[in-house]
Amino acid sequence: MRLALLYHQFITRGGLEGYLMEFAGHLKSAGHELVLVTSRINDAMRDLADEVRIIPPAFTSRGTLAKFAARSAEIVPGLRVDAVLGFGRTWRQDLHRAGGGCHWHYSRMLPWWKRLRPKNQLELALERRLYTGGGTRHFVVNSAKVKLELAGAYQVPPERVSVIHTAVDSQKWQPAATPEIRQALRRQLGIPEGVPALLFASLDHRRKGLGTLLPALAQTPEARLWVAGQSLDAWQPLIQKLGLTDRVTGLGRADLLPWYQAADWFVHPTHYDACANTVLQSMACALPGLISAADGAVEFLREGGNGTILQHPGDVEELATKLRWALGLSGAERRSLGLAARETVLPLTWPAHLAGWEAAWGQSQ
């Protein structure tokens, strides 16, 4: 098939962009031709494309979102393709994947002044047009949670929404081959001998719950925390106030694989996530997780069986209690949870993911 993919930036940035790069690569390997409609594109994505259509960006990110949505809607009817797949704030395509979840639902959790920001209002308006404007045949989401949210917010009929879980490359994301290799990796990464290592990964620390994790960490003095992704500069006053300067280390945009393999727990007290890639990746690496119930990925969690669930992500005391429980497990118990987590996500293969898209395309006809 000749497929058009709509998204305003095909670049290396966050979870959605990473997914799109892998998705495009697997589509190409399956023999499909790709037309990419975008405002920004990196060389790797350009190399995968049979055709690239550029919509010049505006001067601001908000302007780019609005311009891309409007211009792509004009371009779509003239694309000589078999199907158009959208991934952002676009409203005209055959199938649309809401990788970030339901913005209306997330927006309700923001402070009032953030809800009133022009960009937030624009995103809400574009999302409403997507789900109520009639320009899209079928919707794809990555968790059952998001399907329910769309039904509640926009009355999207369930038969128009397919849940296709994100694929996880279990050959790439896998545990260290032996305990000895894992110990050597811990030494290489600077994890002190005998110190429980907690991993937190985020490009939006406020939304992902770092503000809850830091005070909870202060109640569990035996552990140290490594934070990957966004800078910790804005969080240093709180870190210092809590006396955590020597126990919290920022990694920047580090390669997560060695940290998944070396850490003892992945801690993810997010306030909202559709289905975080980091949760699935850490599970594939046999790293047990303490995962927020506000993440759609918890449909893969079995309490005490392959991880543990934080029911109230903003509750410092609950998180501290969960951390103490997690750190109280023996090494053998922790490893058992991790191996069970890996077994849980092994069925999430790319062939299964592409088959889900094919089924969704069939439903849209």
Task: List where the protein language model places each region.
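A conserved mid-protein helix/loop that constitutes part of the nucleotide-sugar donor-binding site
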Residues: E17-E22, P196-Q219
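Membrane-proximal helix-turn-helix segments that form the acceptor-binding/catalytic region
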Residues: K119-N142, L148, A153-Y154
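A short, well-ordered alpha-helix in the C-terminal region of glycosyltransferases
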Residues: A184, A332-P347
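Short alpha-helical donor nucleotide-sugar binding micro-motif in glycosyltransferases
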Residues: R253-A254, P258-A263
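Aromatic "clamp/platform" in nucleotide-sugar-dependent glycosyltransferases that forms part
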Residues: H271
